[in-house]
């Protein structure tokens, strides 16, 4: 409870080149408005005084206004999360080619502009936007907006974070033991682990942790399908 959470999920943005920019704006502005409504009691109703209708229609201006207001309050800390940051850009690149992709991520592209605002929002003493965590499939899009957003660190292959996502075998066995005790699991825990290992236990994100593969935390939950 140290931070107010500002959350985006770019998988919700349309990858149709005729709709993508508007879809991106609508998604970001909707999430920013949700953020203000959710934390209105902490931010103070006065925040709406700095968020006129025009600002609420432009993601960069909206984010900048929230950050400036929260920074002036001095006791607000914001953690920004972006899930699947490259979802729609990867689709554009693979479907429409580099021309449309570059329009979004280079020069005055709307994605590049948004990341420029994020970078700017984190600068300065006491900036409310303190931390960022961004996930995606590949670093391609991030590389293309990097000159604007050059404050991030790629932790994908850092050994320290190898088990950040997924279940270790120990965690899996604990979960399966619980379901076995509840009468949900027909097979023994050992039998289930043996069956799951070849299919769901091959996730490793660091070369130095090759013996610490993780189980896919989504797939191992479909216990009813392995009866």
What does each of the following model-derived ranges do?
Residues 139-148, 155-223:
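Amphipathic alpha-helical segments of the small helical/lid subdomains adjacent to P-loop NTPase cores
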Residues 75-101:
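Conserved P-loop NTPase "ATPase switch" module shared by AAA+ and STAND
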Residues 65-71, 101-129:
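Substrate-engagement module of ASCE P-loop NTPases
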Residues 81-83, 113, 130-137:
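Structural recognition of the conserved hydrophobic beta-strand(s) that form the central parallel beta-sheet
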Residues 50-66:
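Short glycine-rich substrate-engagement loop in P-loop NTPases that contacts/grips substrate
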Residues 11-16, 86-87, 138-143:
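Conserved nucleotide-binding/hydrolysis micro-motifs of P-loop NTPases
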Residues 1-37:
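P-loop NTPase motor core
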Residues 226-227:
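Conserved small/polar residues in nucleotide/adenosyl-binding loops
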């Amino acid at each position: 409870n140290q931070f107010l959470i500002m959350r985006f999920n770019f998988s919700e943005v349309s990858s149709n080149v005729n709709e993508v920019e508007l879809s991106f704006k609508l998604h970001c502005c909707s999430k920013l408005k949700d953020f203000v409504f959710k934390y209105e009691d902490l931010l103070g109703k006065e925040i709406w005084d700095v968020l006129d209708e025009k600002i609420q229609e432009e993601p960069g201006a909206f984010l900048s206004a929230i950050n400036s207001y929260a920074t002036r309050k001095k006791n607000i800390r914001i953690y920004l999360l972006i899930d699947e940051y490259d979802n729609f850009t990867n689709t554009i690149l693979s479907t429409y080619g580099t021309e449309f992709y570059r329009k979004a991520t280079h020069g005055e592209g709307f994605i590049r502009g948004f990341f420029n605002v994020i970078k700017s929002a984190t600068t300065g003493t006491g900036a409310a936007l303190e931390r960022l965590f961004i996930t995606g499939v590949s670093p391609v899009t991030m590389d293309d907006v990097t000159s604007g957003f050059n404050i991030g660190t790629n932790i994908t292959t850092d050994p320290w974070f190898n088990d950040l996502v997924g279940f270790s075998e120990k965690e899996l066995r604990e979960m399966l033991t619980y379901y076995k005790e509840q009468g949900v699991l027909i097979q023994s825990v050992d039998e289930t682990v043996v069956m799951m290992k070849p299919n769901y236990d091959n996730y490793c994100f660091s070369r130095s942790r090759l013996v610490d593969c993780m189980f896919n935390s989504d797939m191992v939950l479909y216990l009813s399908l392995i009866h």
